Design a protein with these regions (language model features):
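A short, flexible loop at the N-terminus of ABC-type nucleotide-binding domains that lies
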Residues: 2-31
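Helical segment within the ABC ATPase nucleotide-binding domain
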Residues: 170-184
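Hydrophobic anchor residue at the start of the ABC signature
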Residues: 145
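Walker B catalytic motif
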Residues: 160-161
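H-loop/switch region of ABC-family ATPase nucleotide-binding domains
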Residues: 191-193
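Conserved beta-strand-loop-alpha-helix hinge in the C-terminal portion
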Residues: 212-250
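The feature captures the beta-strand-to-loop junction immediately N-terminal to the Walker
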Residues: 33-35
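ABC ATPase nucleotide-binding domain signature region
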Residues: 29, 44-108
């Protein structure tokens, strides 16, 4: 279980994740599904060591996800908040929208992996001469991916970071991530609401329901609905799986206008 601490005396803690358990072998590509507010972002932050959990119940590669700082050398976490905060490598109090040359950002890290950097620059279509105050949202996202992926990772946590990418860059990125899992044994957990091109990508699926609990998890080969849709030649099995599960929740519990992440309230259909 994971709960955010209460802000007022006597107020109950806000329980976000309930009886959650995820186990993935090296080389897995896990697609994380769920409605807005189901706890996907919270889960990824817990795995990324961004939230302190009670005891040592959350382990990544056999060690405590929060307390073992060495994990940050082999664990990467990318979300949509990048570029919205001040960061050390750009200088104290200097936002990413300032006049910064892409080639000079995290220059030491880039220089440690020149071949990987050059591969990502070509893959993502990044120009090292770009200035951060002149790039579009999609270009800024490409820069984030370049800097976040240049160091080889053992586990990669992605929270909807492909939303701004054009279709070609997104497709090439997903193929590259698949290669990383197959050749280096890296593990990827990817939360998204965009399912085009993902029908054959994941090895595993994990569905978070409205309670922040596991609705279904396991290898794709064990999901009967997926096998049925592939047999029927459905044009987009992953999209159909997501809409089937989400609409079933709406039918049972009502329309979601607040979820586990505290984004509002839940409104009944009746």
């Amino acid at each position: 279980d994971f709960a955010y601490p209460s802000s007022l005396p006597g107020e109950d803690e806000h329980l976000v994740l309930k009886n959650f358990c995820m186990q993935l072998k090296p080389g897995s590509r896990c697609l994380l599904l769920g409605a807005n507010g189901s706890g996907k972002s919270t889960l990824l932050k817990v795995l990324a060591g961004k939230h302190l959990t009670k005891g040592d119940r959350v382990k990544v590669m056999g060690t405590d996800a929060f307390r073992d700082l060495k994990l940050n050398l082999t664990r990467a976490f990318l979300d949509t908040q990048w570029g919205m905060r001040t960061v050390a490598f750009a200088g104290y109090g200097c936002p990413l929208q300032a006049d910064i040359r892409v080639g000079g950002m995290m220059e030491k890290l880039q220089s440690q992996y020149p071949e990987r950097r050059d591969e990502l620059v070509k893959l993502l279509g990044v120009n090292p001469e770009w200035r951060m105050h002149r790039v579009s949202d999609g270009q800024r996202r490409r820069v984030q991916l370049l800097l976040g992926l240049v160091r080889p990772f053992d586990i990669l946590l992605l929270d909807e970071v492909t939303t701004c990418l054009d279709v070609i860059v997104r497709q090439d990125l997903m193929r590259w991530l698949q290669k990383e899992t197959e050749t280096r044994g890296a593990t990827v957990v990817y939360a998204t609401h965009i399912f085009d091109g993902l029908d054959d990508w994941p090895t595993h699926l994990h569905y978070l329901n409205r309670h922040g609990a596991t609705g279904w998890q396991g290898p794709m080969g064990e999901l009967a609905l997926y096998a049925q849709l592939r047999k029927e030649g459905h044009p987009s099995p992953m999209l159909k799986i997501a809409t089937t599960w989400l609409r079933a929740e709406i039918a049972e519990f009502g329309v979601a206008v607040e979820g586990a992440d505290g984004e509002g309230a839940r409104e009944s259909k009746n």
